[in-house]
């Protein structure tokens, strides 16, 4: 047995399914998950000594690559001063100044410890501010594992929420309306059915949890208009897209102004950080100034703030996002060319430093139904064959891939060459 296999066997005796987050178990592709010993730049190294070109990037945070010296040094320096104080620090102020400077729609920001905390808190704030209970989310979009968000859609354009996980009471889910991503008609139908009850829309501006599905041109502006028409708040969940699709996020890339923004992943530079913020009048409703309660023992802790501050300063440097776009575009185009040569039907969506690979005969993939129609079994084989080639993709047909500026054009070309060999056997 390999070291990964031995560790996985031991882990399953102690940790549910052997992992601390479900997708890591390789359930979506089968086989034994890799146990990682270290990472540097664009590469992961497993406990068996194998190296992989990494397109998971810790599920998004590693936009600068692994083990970036500026972030590593910032963490070391902060740790020497103490790990957590439970009191305000100068770095929290500097971090808030930087975030609100980089994302101009955020007049104020509050730090939390994860993307789930950010979305959960933003929704509570929207409900408290508007005095309304219902929310709209989209089929196939993921906003963390808060009870009200673990909801799936049934048939039809408008579906009253049904729990997607045991342990979520139906009474919690009934206030969550699920609409179809990239379908404004389904959203209008929800508002017309509940014109005075919907507090907010929460949306991934690029859906990254049904692989990578960008918005149609009219979708995000249409959501803004509907929120304005019916008095609801628009929450853009930039946990995945923030500082990756563009410096000011997908909201800037697509030209839409939210009321609240949720951030995570890159904002922590690899440490557990989330944030939510937006309009000053809305944020003023948070405790202790306002009545909407939110708190966290480790929120804004000095280690995480130091890592995030160092990361964002690097991400804000000229040329970072142009490089991300260039590398991602080259990978997408190369994969499509290699698939066409082998007669493999393929769609590759990409925007900024995100991409998604779909095995499908369709000309495009724009919604959850399109994603579900793709050939998942072929993806599973593709994943394992690419792994054998030393390329680590997301171990699920429903997760986006992530580029970093640490990837070289040689890495990209080697990945395309590996895919060409795999497609020939697929």
From Swiss-Prot:
InterPro entries referenced in this protein's UniProt entry, alphabetically: 4pyrrol_synth_GluAld_NH2Trfase, Aminotrans_3, Aminotrans_3_PPA_site, PyrdxlP-dep_Trfase, PyrdxlP-dep_Trfase_major, PyrdxlP-dep_Trfase_small
A cellular component term, taken from the record's GO annotations: cytoplasm
Major place of residence: cytoplasm
Named cofactor requirement(s): pyridoxal 5'-phosphate
NCBIfam families: hemL, PRK00062.1
Family recorded in the similarity comment: Belongs to the class-III pyridoxal-phosphate-dependent aminotransferase family. HemL subfamily.
Protein name, as recorded: Glutamate-1-semialdehyde 2,1-aminomutase
Protein species of origin: Shigella dysenteriae serotype 1 (strain Sd197)
């Amino acid at each position: 047995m390999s070291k990964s296999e031995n560790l996985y066997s031991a882990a399953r005796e102690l940790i549910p399914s052997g992992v601390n987050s479900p997708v890591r178990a390789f359930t979506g592709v089968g086989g034994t998950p890799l146990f990682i010993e270290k990472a540097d730049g664009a590469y992961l190294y497993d406990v068996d000594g194998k190296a992989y070109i990494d397109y998971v990037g810790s599920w998004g945070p590693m936009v600068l690559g692994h083990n970036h010296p500026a972030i590593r040094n910032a963490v070391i320096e902060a740790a020497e001063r103490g790990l957590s104080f439970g009191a305000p620090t100068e770095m929290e102020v500097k971090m808030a100044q930087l975030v609100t400077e980089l994302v101009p729609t955020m007049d104020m920001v509050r730090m939390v410890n994860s993307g789930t905390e950010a979305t959960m808190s933003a929704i509570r704030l929207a409900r408290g501010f508007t005095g309304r209970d219902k929310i709209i989310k989209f089929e196939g979009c993921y906003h963390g594992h808060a009870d009200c968000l673990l909801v799936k859609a049934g048939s039809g354009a408008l579906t009253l929420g049904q729990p997607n996980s045991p342990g979520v009471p139906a009474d919690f889910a009934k206030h969550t309306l699920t609409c179809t991503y990239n379908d404004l008609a389904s959203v209008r139908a929800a508002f017309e059915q509940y014109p005075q009850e919907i507090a907010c829309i929460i949306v991934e501006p690029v859906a990254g949890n049904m692989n990578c599905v960008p918005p149609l041109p009219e979708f995000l502006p249409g959501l803004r208009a509907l929120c304005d028409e019916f008095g609801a708040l628009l929450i853009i969940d930039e946990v995945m897209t923030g500082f990756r699709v563009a410096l000011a996020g997908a909201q800037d890339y697509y030209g839409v102004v939210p009321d609240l923004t949720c951030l995570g992943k890159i904002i922590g530079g690899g440490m557990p950080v989330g944030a939510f913020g937006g309009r000053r009048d809305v944020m003023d409703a948070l405790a202790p100034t306002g009545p909407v309660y939110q708190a966290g023992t480790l929120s804004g802790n000095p280690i995480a703030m130091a890592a995030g501050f160092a990361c964002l300063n690097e991400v804000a440097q000229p040329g970072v996002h142009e490089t991300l776009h260039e590398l991602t575009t080259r990978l997408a185009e190369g994969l499509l060319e290699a698939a066409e040569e082998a007669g493999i039907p393929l769609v590759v969506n990409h925007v900024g430093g995100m991409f998604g690979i779909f095995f499908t005969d369709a000309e495009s993939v724009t919604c959850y139904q399109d994603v579900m129609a793709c050939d998942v079994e072929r993806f599973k084989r593709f994943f394992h064959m690419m792994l054998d080639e030393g390329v680590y993709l997301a171990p699920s047909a429903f997760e986006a891939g992530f580029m970093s500026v640490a990837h070289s054009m040689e890495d990209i070309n080697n990945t395309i060459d590996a895919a060409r060999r795999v497609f020939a056997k697929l």
